[in-house]
A protein has these predicted regions:
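An N-cap/entry alpha-helix motif that binds or orients negatively charged groups
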Residues: 1-87, 195-237, 372-374, 380-387
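Glycine- and other small-residue-rich loops at beta-strand/loop junctions that grip anionic moieties
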Residues: 48, 104-105, 128-131, 150-153, ...
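C-terminal helical cap(s) of enzyme catalytic domains, especially alpha/beta-barrels
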Residues: 59, 291-301, 340-361
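Short, conserved beta-strand segments within well-ordered enzyme catalytic domains
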Residues: 67, 73, 82-84, 93-97, ...
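Glycine-rich active-site/cofactor-binding loop and its immediate structural neighborhood
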Residues: 90-134
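A gly/proline- and charged-residue-enriched helix-loop-helix capping module
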Residues: 111, 121-142, 146-161
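Alpha/beta enzyme core
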Residues: 116-117, 121, 142, 156-309, ...
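Active-site-adjacent helical/loop segments in soluble small-molecule enzymes
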Residues: 367
Length: 387
């Protein structure tokens, strides 16, 4: 049983002895305080999105178009938030989505390791970005028994792709998440206005620097790392590449960026084990549809296969709504990044426990004892359109 709601009781009792949490309880304050703790360029990179950031913004506000219907006399105690994913039982449906500059977001510039420690402490899985400050093999042991997954931006060089995936398998990652929507960077005015692109400056490339195939490509010349990375990054994959991707690993294969039902069906028919519905948090393409609006159709097309979701999740209420719309697991990005920036491991743990406490309390108050009780029938559209 969850017990996540107990986090709020602890906060109240701590206050009786004059101890107040140093970390914010709401997202807006968290973001504002994290901005003060981060360099302007790093905050801009994390906070920014594509174009005028309209899609990024509506990813967030779209959740307010759905409302959860309270059910009374249910006796929602205890509550069960466990979820089965790839043969593992997880204490909650929350996970930390991949963030390519997470390594830079702690004061010691070892944010990937810090995130793995958060994973161990909370039981919330981390999807580790390929873009790390520390090599993947040095990161995953810090996650302890919590399953972590490895995210791949598929390089043009197939031998390099195979090497990266094999390393992830050997290191102990439990699944491979292939991001499909970032074979070319989106138009991001915040970053363009300052020429801010961390990889071009040689940051977060530890997994390339430590790869034997990549070392062969640069012939051991470290001065070639950035240009070689630029030349091999970004493989415009097609459906014809899916059998090859499937052949790279026996681990669960999760395809990230799927927003159309037909794409979900083709992905699963082609050997994917799960769908990851996401529009990259609005960072890649402007002028789109809020990711949460795609979720019901993708879930229906997945026909029982796991569907992971992220984009715009800022609260426990958002988590509950995504679960009711059919997500198997729900990812957060900027919230835990800001927690790390503000307080390292402790800051991110606070963010995660706060989200889970709010979600647990909503299930209690509104009468939903388990995740199985949450469905699209538990929601109404507040904007007058049909669900």
């Amino acid at each position: 049983m969850s017990g996540f709601a107990d986090y709020q009781i602890g906060i109240y009792f701590d206050a009786l002895t004059g101890t107040q949490s140093p970390y914010p309880m709401d997202y807006a304050t968290l973001e504002r305080k994290a901005q003060a703790a981060m360099s302007p360029s790093l905050f801009s990179y994390v906070a920014g999105g594509a174009g005028d950031e309209a899609t990024q913004d509506i990813n967030v506000t779209a959740f307010s178009k759905w409302g959860l219907i309270p059910r009374m006399l249910v006796g929602a105690e205890p509550r069960d938030m466990t979820v089965e994913l790839f043969g593992e039982t997880l204490a909650s449906p929350l996970f930390m989505a991949p963030v390519g500059v997470i390594g830079l977001c702690t004061q010691d510039a070892h944010g990937d390791i810090a995130t793995a420690k958060v994973s161990a402490e909370t039981g919330v899985p981390m999807v580790a970005s390929i873009l790390m400050e520390d090599p993947m093999e040095e990161v995953v042991p810090y996650a302890g028994d919590t399953p972590n997954y490895f995210q791949l931006y598929t390089p043009k060089d197939r031998d390099l792709a195979a090497s990266l995936v094999q390393r992830a398998e050997v290191a102990g990652y439990k699944g491979i998440v292939v991001t499909l929507d970032t074979w070319v960077p989106g138009w991001r005015p915040r970053d363009l206005s300052t020429g801010n692109f961390p990889q071009i400056r040689g940051k977060v490339l530890a997994n390339y620097r430590t790869d034997p195939v990549f070392q062969q490509m640069i012939e051991g010349d470290e001065s070639r790392v950035v240009m070689e990375w630029v030349s091999t990054f970004g493989n415009p994959l097609t459906w014809d590449d899916l059998p090859w991707l499937r052949s790279l690993t026996k681990l669960p294969l999760i395809l990230k960026g799927i927003c159309h039902p037909e794409d979900a069906r083709r992905a699963l028919d082609g050997g994917a084990d799960a769908i990851y519905c996401s529009n990259h948090g609005g960072r890649q393409a402007n002028g789109g549809v809020p990711a949460i609006e795609h979720l019901p159709g993708v879930v229906e097309a997945a026909d029982g296969a796991p569907v992971l979701f992220d984009s715009g999740v800022r609260s426990g209420a958002d988590v509950i709504k995504a679960l009711a719309l059919g997500a198997t697991a729900v990812g957060i990005g900027r919230p835990y990044v800001y927690g790390l920036a503000l307080g390292g491991v402790a800051g991110a743990v606070h963010v995660i426990r706060s989200l889970l406490a709010e979600a647990d309390l909503i299930m209690a108050v509104d009468g939903y004892p388990s995740l199985a009780d949450l469905s699209i029938e538990a929601l109404v559209r507040l904007d007058g359109s049909h669900s």
